[in-house]
């Protein structure tokens, strides 16, 4: 049995497309130069993406900042928010449940006035068919 000196080449290799030939060449060289052919393009895409996304993110926050406005005391009263009158030194915080503005000290004293030692645990009423957790 005699082996041929020429290597076997399938008939469709001559008619292969450019992308197939480039892909085969890329895969062959990838093991020789992994950083140059894989790592460097990956890092460059990440860095280019950060430069592209920075203006988009800035535009997002600028649009949000345009929506936020400072409200004067009269406008706040018109919105239904009440604040202390004459207390310029007290910082005012918004209470979302009552929509009344009050200072932190006022809230602290209100909580201290409540009797927190005598309380009773009450079960929440469940919907029909909902398990209540009792065994």
From Swiss-Prot:
The chain crosses the membrane at residues 34-54. GO terms for cellular component: mitochondrial inner membrane. It is a single-pass membrane protein. Residues 1-22 form a transit peptide. InterPro entries: Cyt_c_Oxase_assmbl_COX16 (IPR020164). Induction: Slightly induced during the mycelium to yeast transition. It comes from the Eukaryota. It is found in: Mitochondrion inner membrane. The keyword Transit peptide applies. One of its GO terms (biological process) is mitochondrial cytochrome c oxidase assembly. The keyword Nuclease does not apply. Keywords: Membrane, Mitochondrion, Mitochondrion inner membrane, Transit peptide, Transmembrane, Transmembrane helix. Belongs to the COX16 family. Required for the assembly of the mitochondrial respiratory chain complex IV (CIV), also known as cytochrome c oxidase. May participate in merging the COX1 and COX2 assembly lines. This is Cytochrome c oxidase assembly protein COX16, mitochondrial. It comes from Paracoccidioides brasiliensis (strain Pb18).
């Amino acid at each position: 049995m005699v082996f041929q000196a020429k290597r076997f080449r399938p008939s469709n290799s001559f008619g292969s497309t450019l992308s197939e030939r480039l892909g085969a060449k890329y895969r062959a060289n990838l093991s020789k130069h992994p950083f140059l052919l894989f790592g460097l393009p990956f890092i460059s895409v990440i860095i280019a993406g950060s430069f592209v996304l920075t203006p988009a993110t800035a535009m997002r926050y600028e649009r949000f900042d345009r929506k936020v406005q400072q409200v004067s005391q009269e406008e706040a009263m018109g919105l239904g928010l009440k604040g202390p009158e004459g207390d310029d030194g007290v910082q005012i915080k918004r209470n979302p449940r009552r929509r009344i503005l009050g200072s932190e000290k006022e809230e602290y004293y209100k909580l201290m006035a409540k009797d927190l030692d005598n309380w009773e645990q009450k079960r929440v009423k469940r919907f029909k068919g909902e398990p209540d957790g009792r065994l």
